[in-house]
C-alpha cells in the first residue's frame, strides 16, 4: 500500500462537521455588511511580490520571513497573499474606483504566512477584511468599530471581547517618536531579548508589542507615543473616543498598541479576548492614509480592519448548532426508490429551506434506520412495500417519543407542514 499524502503543516482541512458553524458565521457577516452598506469585492490569492514589499514594508517580519514567494514560468516573482489590504487597494487603483469616489468594501478568503503553527495560528488561515476609501474623519473610524461590535453581538461573543485603541499619529510624528524610542532602548540595550534587539534596527515600534514578560518593566518606562502627537492627530483621536462614549462602547487606550504593518497611521484598534490563550487578537485594523499614494494613486484617506475566522469561530464555541437534516428518507425496494425520488423533489419544491437526505445505495429497513439515526435527522420518512401498496407514506420522529404518522402520499406536504419545524 502506498504512503498516504498528508496536508501541508499548518494548512488544515475544514471537515463537514465544522462547516455548518463556518456557514452560519459567514451568514451573519454578510448580513451585518449589508446593514452598513458595504459591498463585497473578490480578489486573487496570488499577487506580484512587489505589491507587498511596497505596502507592508521590506523590513517587516511578514516580508522578510513569512511570505510564500515563487517564480512563475516567465520569471516574475509572485506571492500567496499574506493579507488583503494591499490586494484590495491594488484592484481599486487598477480599475479606477478611487477617482473622486468613496467606497465601503469587504472581502473574505484564505491568507498565507509561513509562521510556526500553534493553537489559533495557521500557515493558511481565513480572514474577512473591510476597507473604506475617501473618508478622512473620525466618524468612519467609529463606524468600523460599531460594525464589528454589532457582529460580535449577532454571534453572541460581545461579552468575550474588549476594544483597545491607540493613535500612531502622522508618519512624521511617528518617525520623530521612533528616534526617541530607539534612543531609550539603546540606553537599555542589555535588557532587550534577542527578538527585540533584532527589531531595534528594523522595526523598533514592534518592540512595544513584545509578549515577553521579561520586557515588561523596560517597556513600562518607555516614552509614550501619545505624548508626541500634534494637535490634528490629538483632535482626530478625541473625535473618535467622543463618538464611542456617546454610543456607550467601552474601550481601553493602550499606548503600546502599534500594529505589525508599516502603513498604519493615526487610529489603530484591536478586539482582543482572554479565552484563546496567547492568540488573543480576533480583529485588528486602523488608518493607512499614505498607502494609496505609496502604491501609485493620488493621496487619499483609507481605513480598514481584518478579523480572523478561525479564532472567531473558536470563540463562538457551541453558539451555533449543526445544520442536521430535518428528514432522512428511507425507501425499500426498486419501486419505492423510484417513487421516493419523485416525492423528494416535490418536497424540495414545496419547502425550499427543507434539509432532506434521501437514502442511496439500498439496504434493509434496519440498516437505513441506523443511517438515519447517525445523520442526526429529526424525522425519518418511510416508503416501503406496505406504503407502496396502500399509496401511503409514514413520518417517524427520531428525537422524541411522539407517535409515527401515516398518511396518503397526496397529503404528504400537509403532513410535513404540520409536523416538521422548517
UniProtKB/Swiss-Prot annotation:
Task: Give a single Pfam family match.
Answer: tRNA-synt_His
A Gene Ontology cellular-component term: cytoplasm
Instruction: List, alphabetically, the CDD domains matched.
Output: HisRS-like_core, HisRS_anticodon
GO BP, one annotated term: histidyl-tRNA aminoacylation
PROSITE patterns per record: AA_TRNA_LIGASE_II
* Location(s), subcellular: Cytoplasm
Q: Which Gene3D superfamilies match?
A: Anticodon-binding domain, Bira Bifunctional Protein, Domain 2
Q: Name one GO molecular function term.
A: ATP binding
Keywords from UniProt, A to Z, are: Aminoacyl-tRNA synthetase, ATP-binding, Cytoplasm, Ligase, Nucleotide-binding, Protein biosynthesis
Catalytic activity, per the record? tRNA(His) + L-histidine + ATP = L-histidyl-tRNA(His) + AMP + diphosphate + H(+)
Cytoplasm as UniProt keyword:
yes
Statement: the UniProt record of this protein carries the keyword Nucleotidyltransferase: no
Q: Which domain of life is it from?
A: Bacteria
Where is this protein primarily located? cytoplasm
EC number annotated for this UniProt entry: 6.1.1.21
UniProt similarity note:
Belongs to the class-II aminoacyl-tRNA synthetase family.
**What does the record note on quaternary structure?**
Homodimer.
Designated name of the protein? Histidine--tRNA ligase
Gene name linked to the record: hisS
